[in-house]
């Protein structure tokens, strides 16, 4: 947050880590609805005003005003408490409910939730599980879900399915290269050529290849290196290629 603290969501509530004191403090502020964050925290996001939004399984969406130290609880009693993921776009809040649909409303939640419909009037995320979203160029947003990778322009409503594999995570390596983590390996989508490269675990051991097909997280660091976290195979690292070189593999039958 703006004070340098790290907010940690767990399966039993929310904690604040102070790196200076090296200490954790439980966040147990009572909301305007008399609720306290006690369940599985599915997501934490900070807005442009340094206020925090927290989605909690079975408890809905919380808004923490850091300057006033006040907590508001939305959707907790509307039968819509299973907020799996959310994001803010100006004064609009987008909410992905687990196995339900993608909805939007004003960030003050004074208007009812509306399901998203594309330009053809179809609810393309109905019964879907949205796992990740990332904003790309030309007003397009890319959404990873249980149904695959979808490209959406929320201004025009135009949408198209790019990939059908169960997608969990997204990260741009560059403006025209999107990495997609799925249960079937890593897909690299080139926005310029509209081509997809599919990387999977090879049939034989290869220290330079992907270690597991179940990709759960992708992160680009400050040096443009790509970190790929998997379910069974640990973490893979792909450094930025300042220069290209050929890899040579050792063979036991050849000795010098």
Region locations from a protein language model:
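Carboxylate-rich, polar loop motifs that coordinate divalent cations or form catalytic acidic clusters
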Residues: 1-256
């Amino acid at each position: 947050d703006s004070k340098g603290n790290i907010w940690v969501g767990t399966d039993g509530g929310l904690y604040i880590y102070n790196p200076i004191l090296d200490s954790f403090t439980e966040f147990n502020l009572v909301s305007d609805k008399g609720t306290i964050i006690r369940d599985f925290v599915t997501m934490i996001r900070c807005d442009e005003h340094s206020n925090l939004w927290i989605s909690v399984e079975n408890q809905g969406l919380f808004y923490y005003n850091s300057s006033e130290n006040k907590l508001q609880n939305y959707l907790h009693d509307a039968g819509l408490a299973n907020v799996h993921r959310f994001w803010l776009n100006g004064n609009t809040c987008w909410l992905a409910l687990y196995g339900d649909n993608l909805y939007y409303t004003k960030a003050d939640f004074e208007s009812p939730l509306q399901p998203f419909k594309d330009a053809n009037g179809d609810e393309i995320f109905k019964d879907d599980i949205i796992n990740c979203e990332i904003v790309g160029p030309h007003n397009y947003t890319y959404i990873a879900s249980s149904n695959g990778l979808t490209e959406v322009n929320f201004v025009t409503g135009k949408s198209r399915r790019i990939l059908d594999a169960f997608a969990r995570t997204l990260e741009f390596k560059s403006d025209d290269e999107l990495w997609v983590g799925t249960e079937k390996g890593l897909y690299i989508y080139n926005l310029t050529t509209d081509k997809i490269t599919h990387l999977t675990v090879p049939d034989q051991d290869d220290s330079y290849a992907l270690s597991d097909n179940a990709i759960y997280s992708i992160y680009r660091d400050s040096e443009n290196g790509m970190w790929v976290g998997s379910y069974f195979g640990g973490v893979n690292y792909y450094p930025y290629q300042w220069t290209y070189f050929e890899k040579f593999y050792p063979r036991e039958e050849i000795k010098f």
